From Swiss-Prot:
HAMAP family: IF_3. It comes from the Bacteria. The gene is infC. Pfam families: IF3_C, IF3_N. This is Translation initiation factor IF-3. Monomer. It comes from Caldanaerobacter subterraneus subsp. tengcongensis (strain DSM 15242 / JCM 11007 / NBRC 100824 / MB4) (Thermoanaerobacter tengcongensis). One of its GO terms (cellular component) is cytosol. One of its GO terms (molecular function) is translation initiation factor activity.
Length: 180
């Protein structure tokens, strides 16, 4: 008689597989989802060996625990595949920063505006920072007007998430992309 023993590594979900199941009785379900019945864990393991499958405890908190006959390696592969698909569907929102001085020229302002539009179209938030040097800090109203003008230009691409505010020697504002 050939005994198949698989080397199974327990992943982060801590499944109990084959010999690791120490319960006296288990409720057994076959690979098609049909209930076989309540039996000892040893009998269930023997059935799994006969069918060249693994015995996996899927509901440990039930009384008796529910075990299923399945190819555990294939099951783990499908789980990891589903997790990767879920990660791909999640959109990671980055915050891109654009720095300006309070006395920026019109052409430079346009260049910064174009890069902000690109960031917002990509789905990233834009943090606009105006840095004050020396005596420039006395003219915060100019910087606030500049940020409001910047927000007005970007109105069709994004909304102001955080209004212009002082943070040390910087004035900043955050613009979030519009939902599609």
């Amino acid at each position: 008689m050939i005994i198949f023993r698989r080397c199974v590594f327990i992943n982060h979900r801590d499944f109990q597989v084959n010999e690791q199941i120490r319960d006296k009785e288990v409720r057994l379900i076959d690979q098609d989802g049909k209930q076989i019945g309540i039996m000892s864990a040893k009998e269930a393991y023997k059935i799994a060996q006969e069918r060249h499958l693994d015995l996996v405890k899927i509901v440990p908190n039930a009384n008796p625990p529910v075990c299923k006959l399945m190819d555990f390696g294939k099951y783990r592969y499908e789980l990891s595949k589903r997790e990767k698909e879920a990660k791909k569907k999640q959109k990671i929102i980055n915050v891109k920063e654009i720095r300006m001085s309070p006395n920026i020229e019109d052409h430079d302002f346009g260049v910064k505006l174009k890069s902000a539009i690109k960031f917002l179209k990509d789905g990233d938030k834009v943090k606009v920072t105006i840095r004050f040097r020396g005596r420039e800090a006395a003219h915060t109203s100019l910087a606030e007007d500049l940020l409001k003008r910047f927000a007005e230009e970007l109105r069709e691409y994004g909304n102001v998430e955080k209004a212009p505010s002082m943070d040390g020697r910087n004035m900043m504002m955050v613009i979030a992309p519009k939902k599609q």
